[in-house]
């Protein structure tokens, strides 16, 4: 496989996406499957396409992604982050556009841990006065 590609890593919650961008015709492959097959929800497909559409490169580049961990939404947002980072290597002039859209920022929000003595991270057990 001697095709030239640009590489980007994206993360969200516990999901990690390793993204490769090739010159091509607009195909997106996730874990060896078409991304419409891997992410059947239209909202997730839209999230993944956002950086390519914003950069007006949706039909000029092929994307191959390996994604692991997390749930479907976290994985889709990790893929978006990875594609955005790889696009910077394709064309550094895209930085202000992608940054303004918030695609280059790693969303650091994670699930807060459950604390002892509580029912969940912050929720208490029901209190009965009598």
From Swiss-Prot:
Superkingdom to which the source organism belongs: Bacteria
Keywords: Ribonucleoprotein, Ribosomal protein
GO terms assigned for molecular function: RNA binding; structural constituent of ribosome
Any single GO BP term: translation
Residue runs in coiled coils: none
InterPro entries: Ribosomal_Su5_D2-typ_SF (IPR020568), Ribosomal_uS9 (IPR000754), Ribosomal_uS9_bac/plastid (IPR023035), Ribosomal_uS9_CS (IPR020574), Ribsml_uS5_D2-typ_fold_subgr (IPR014721)
S-S bridge residues: none
Keyword Ribonucleoprotein applies: yes
Gene3D superfamilies membership: 3.30.230.10
GO cellular component terms given for this protein: cytoplasm; small ribosomal subunit
Family indicated by similarity: Belongs to the universal ribosomal protein uS9 family.
Listed name of the protein: Small ribosomal subunit protein uS9
């Amino acid at each position: 496989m001697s095709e030239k590609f640009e590489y980007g890593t994206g993360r969200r919650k516990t999901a990690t996406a390793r993204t490769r961008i090739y010159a091509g015709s607009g195909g997106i492959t996730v874990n060896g499957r078409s991304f419409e097959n891997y992410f059947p929800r239209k909202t997730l497909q839209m999230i993944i396409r956002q950086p390519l559409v914003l950069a007006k490169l949706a039909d000029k580049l092929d994307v191959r992604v390996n994604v692991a961990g997390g749930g479907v939404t976290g994985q889709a947002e990790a893929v978006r982050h990875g594609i955005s980072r790889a696009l910077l290597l394709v064309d550094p002039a895209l930085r202000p556009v992608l940054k303004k859209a918030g695609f280059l920022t790693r969303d650091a929000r994670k699930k807060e841990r459950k604390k002892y003595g509580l029912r969940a991270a912050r929720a208490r057990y029901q209190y009965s006065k009598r």
